[in-house]
Amino acid sequence: MEEYFDVLDEEGMPSGITKPKSEVHTKGYWHRTVHIWIINENNEILLQRRSNTKKRNPNILTISCEGHVSAGESSIQGAIRELDEELGLKVKNEDLKYIKSIKRAENRATNYYNNEFKDFYILRTNVKVEEIIYQKEEISEVMYVTWETLKDIIHTNEVIIREYSYDILEDYFKNKS
């Protein structure tokens, strides 16, 4: 069954209209997504490798967890659901630190528009890689990397992390000390 999203206005407020995912992307409706960086006690960052069955960017390392906010969900509810669905992590509202929201309009292909309000969160947790029960249809592996390693690999063909997402993580590390 196709996912439905709340259509947002240009300011990120709900319009009261819901549309199926396919229509949201073909018509370019504004909608909300969540992006969660997971960081352990050693300040290592969890990355996921996208499954080789993914249509876009298969076998590529990316942010710890991300996904669309479903119709009727708040941003934090969407983040909690995505962490559970993708990584099997059970978290509560207070476990997530909201960082910021950015507005991005991206035309990735003919008749495919990604007009999103992207909400970023940090999850500090000491979950071990072997404890993560990831969604096999979405993810082929997860791994922790140091900040230095991430800086070294960020511009390689093995990683797809948008510059704005990387910048948010970099600001977090600069401001936390």
Regions found by a protein language model. Name each.
Residues 90-100:
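A short coil-to-beta-strand element that immediately follows conserved catalytic motifs
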